[in-house]
A protein has these predicted regions:
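Beta-sheet entry/capping signal
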Residues: 1-3, 74-77, 88-90, 150-153, ...
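Nucleic-acid-processing active sites and adjacent nucleic-acid-binding tracks
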Residues: 66-67, 93-152
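ATPase catalytic-site recognition across NTP-hydrolyzing enzymes
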Residues: 2-80
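Short glycine-rich phosphate-binding loop at a beta-alpha junction
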Residues: 147-159, 164
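Phosphate/oxyanion-binding active-site loops and adjacent basic polyanion-contact surfaces
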Residues: 87, 128-137, 225-231
Length: 235
């Protein structure tokens, strides 16, 4: 039974903020309507699938489709989740499409971004050897030649010092960003509020659906699974 039935001193209005910030969790905890596996991070598969409405304009050889063109009015942001031997090395490119006014609780309004993840590219280690990070670096540099105005390229901490310096040497701004639970919570908010559009990639969807809440500060993948593409998009 819902909390407001069991406890007459509470009403559904008392939980407006909870339903606004995390509808799936609020349905389970306060309305006794579980929609999902309780330790899953993304609790609404339909919202994830709805957000993945774009084709990914990158083929298996990491070539960007000629028909995809950057918008000169947009600034593009890149995040790379580096890996060489055991995981995929993934790079995602995103931009803010526009800013919109959105009603929040108590009739307040807030100006918030509509975000588009334009593409995701990834490299996998092979029997012959690990991922060549210089190939990843050159792919990022080629984005500028493609016409993208790059605002920032961020990397997780693993093995990114050299590649950051090499990109800086050709005039590309870089920084370090270790994706954590806070970043995933921000992305979940975008998804639940229909403010994120991204490519439909089966690997990415599977990764995001398998993410688990491990602790107050950590979101992680199950054993023998991965979250490489997911981390790239989240960053």
């Amino acid at each position: 039974r819902p909390t407001w039935d069991v406890n007459p001193t509470r009403s559904i209005d008392d939980f407006k903020l909870a339903f606004y910030t995390d509808p799936g969790d609020a349905l389970m905890r306060f309305a006794c309507m579980p929609q999902f596996q309780s330790d899953a991070f993304f609790k609404q598969r339909d919202k994830l699938e709805l957000a993945m409405s774009l084709p990914n304009p990158v083929d298996k050889f990491k070539r960007i489709e000629p028909r995809w063109e950057p918008n000169p009015d947009f600034t593009y942001f890149v995040h790379a989740d580096l890996a060489q031997k055991h995981d995929k090395c993934a790079v995602a490119i995103s931009h803010v499409e526009k800013w919109v006014e959105m009603k929040t609780f108590n009739d307040y309004t807030q100006v918030v971004p509509m975000v588009v993840t334009d593409m995701v590219a990834w490299w996998e280690p092979k029997v012959e050897g690990p991922v060549d990070l210089s190939e990843v670096k050159n792919w990022i540099i080629a984005l500028r030649r493609k016409g993208l105005h790059l605002g920032m390229v961020t990397f997780d901490r693993w093995n990114s010092f050299d590649i950051q310096n090499e990109l800086k040497s050709v005039g590309i701004k870089t920084d370090t960003l270790s994706v954590g639970k806070k970043h995933y919570e921000d992305m979940a908010m975008l998804i639940y509020e229909d403010r994120l559009i991204m490519p439909h990639i089966d690997v990415l969807l599977d990764e995001m659906l398998e993410l688990k809440i491990v602790s107050d500060k950590k979101v992680d993948h199950p054993r023998k699974k991965s979250k490489d593409l997911s981390d790239a998009v989240c960053g």
